[in-house]
């Protein structure tokens, strides 16, 4: 009788352990599936909103008018939004045209630098490396040195000059004291090595 109770207790322990493990596995699976399921509508919502903006000619004309005629921060913001819509829809020339105009109308140095950076990214995406480097060098101010060096490092990496890229990325880490930025750049360097 004592042996039987010991076996039953042992069996109950294994059954409980098995059920606990299965329950944890089910919870993890449900968590990851629900997370992916919830992320998709958000992305499709953003895409739908951008497409609506692009196809709504009245809103588009108001935005373009604001960009072309006014030298204001709201015009700069609108140009960034419109350029993002064009880039998402792979209309890079239109995005460049909008950003170039906004860059010329920029009233704030940081907006000028941000718009220059976005223009350089588009040239980089179009594989126009010389224009990308020329544009990124238009960025003024010491506070942008880290971003500039990181981007130029990416350009050199694409040109198969990995040593120069790593040097620029390391310089970028030194110039930017943020831990998150350092981790991202360190991942680039580690992937090279």
From Swiss-Prot:
Its main location: membrane. Residues 1-11 are cytoplasmic. It is a single-pass type II membrane protein. GO terms for cellular component: plasma membrane. It is found in: Cell membrane. InterPro entries: SecYEG/CpoB_TPR, TPR-like_helical_dom_sf, YfgM. Keywords: Cell membrane, Chaperone, Membrane, Transmembrane, Transmembrane helix. The keyword Lyase does not apply. Residues 35-193 are extracellular. GO terms for molecular function: protein-containing complex binding. The chain crosses the membrane at residues 12-34. It comes from the Bacteria. Belongs to the YfgM family. May mediate protein transfer from the Sec translocon to the chaperone network via its extracellular C-terminal region. Interacts with the Sec translocon. Forms a complex with PpiD. PANTHER family: ANCILLARY SECYEG TRANSLOCON SUBUNIT, UPF0070 PROTEIN YFGM. This is Ancillary SecYEG translocon subunit. It comes from Buchnera aphidicola subsp. Baizongia pistaciae (strain Bp). The lineage of its organism: Bacteria, Pseudomonadati, Pseudomonadota, Gammaproteobacteria, Enterobacterales.
């Amino acid at each position: 009788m004592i042996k039987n109770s010991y076996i039953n207790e042992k069996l109950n322990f294994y059954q409980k352990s098995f059920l606990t493990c299965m329950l944890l596995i089910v919870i993890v699976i449900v968590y990851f599936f629900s997370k992916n399921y919830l992320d998709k509508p958000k992305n499709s919502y953003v895409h739908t909103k951008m497409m609506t903006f692009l196809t709504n000619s009245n809103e588009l004309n108001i935005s373009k008018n604001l960009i072309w005629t006014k030298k204001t921060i709201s015009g700069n913001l609108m140009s960034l939004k419109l350029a993002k819509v064009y880039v998402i829809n792979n209309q890079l020339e239109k995005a460049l045209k909008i950003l170039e105009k906004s860059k010329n109308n920029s009233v704030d140095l940081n907006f000028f630098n941000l718009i220059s950076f976005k223009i350089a990214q588009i040239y980089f995406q179009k594989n126009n490396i010389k224009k990308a480097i020329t544009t990124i060098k238009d960025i003024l101010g010491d506070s942008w040195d880290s971003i500039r060096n990181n981007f130029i490092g990416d350009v050199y990496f694409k040109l198969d000059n990995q040593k120069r890229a790593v040097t620029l990325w390391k310089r970028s880490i030194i110039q930017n004291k943020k831990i998150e930025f350092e981790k991202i750049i360190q991942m680039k360097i580690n992937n090279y090595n």
